[in-house]
């Protein structure tokens, strides 16, 4: 069984009164233990595909299955994004902001999958600046341990086992002193 499966994935962005389709009908599967690379020229949709696989961005259409869970099963993706009536001001300009509103059940499903199955390394530096390396690694584990629906094996670790695991990870990537 594939750990990641995309089927007929699409993503469109509004551009004025037009719509730009950044991803058009992408389908592929990644099996457990398989190495995959997404390549292409700038603007070809690579980051958009990764953001959808990482459950950071919603597809406009299609399906994503992660470790057997159909992420958007039972959800009409075209209804998920709505206009928000809040206004934000920056530099005196008032602009309407869009935000994605997800049904509570889907939000829980996505959060659970992110915590138990996904890891994401961004191009930009996205650590929590007030935390050290150890604490940045520990933080998602603390969140996960509070989630009753979590299925991570780390949930069963004792405090000392978690400390050992975090130190192992730090050493593995060469960040020890």
Whereabouts are the PLM-identified features?
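Short beta-strand immediately N-terminal to the Walker A/P-loop
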Residues: 36-37, 120
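Conserved ABC ATPase "signature" region
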Residues: 69-73, 145, 150-177
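Helix-to-loop junction immediately C-terminal to a conserved catalytic motif
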Residues: 54
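Conserved beta-strand
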Residues: 6-9, 21-31, 62
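Short coil-to-helix segment of the ABC ATPase nucleotide-binding domain corresponding to the Q-loop/switch region
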Residues: 131-140, 147-148
């Amino acid at each position: 069984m594939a750990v990641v499966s995309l089927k007929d994935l699409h993503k469109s962005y509004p551009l004025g009164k037009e719509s730009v389709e950044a991803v058009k009908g992408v389908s592929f599967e990644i099996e457990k233990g398989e190495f995959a690379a997404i390549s292409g020229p700038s603007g070809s949709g690579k980051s958009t595909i990764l953001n959808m696989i990482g459950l950071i961005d919603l597809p406009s259409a299609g399906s994503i299955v992660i470790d057997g869970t159909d992420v958007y099963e039972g959800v009409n993706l075209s209804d998920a994004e709505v206009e928000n009536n809040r206004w934000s001001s920056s530099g005196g300009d008032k602009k309407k902001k869009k935000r994605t509103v997800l049904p509570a059940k889907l939000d829980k499903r996505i959060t659970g999958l992110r915590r138990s199955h996904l890891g994401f390394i961004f191009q930009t530096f996205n650590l929590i600046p007030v935390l050290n390396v150890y604490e940045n690694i520990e933080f998602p584990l603390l969140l996960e341990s509070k989630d009753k629906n979590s299925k991570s094996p780390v949930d069963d670790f004792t405090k000392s086992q978690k400390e050992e695991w975090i130190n192992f990870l730090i050493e593995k990537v060469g960040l020890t002193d």
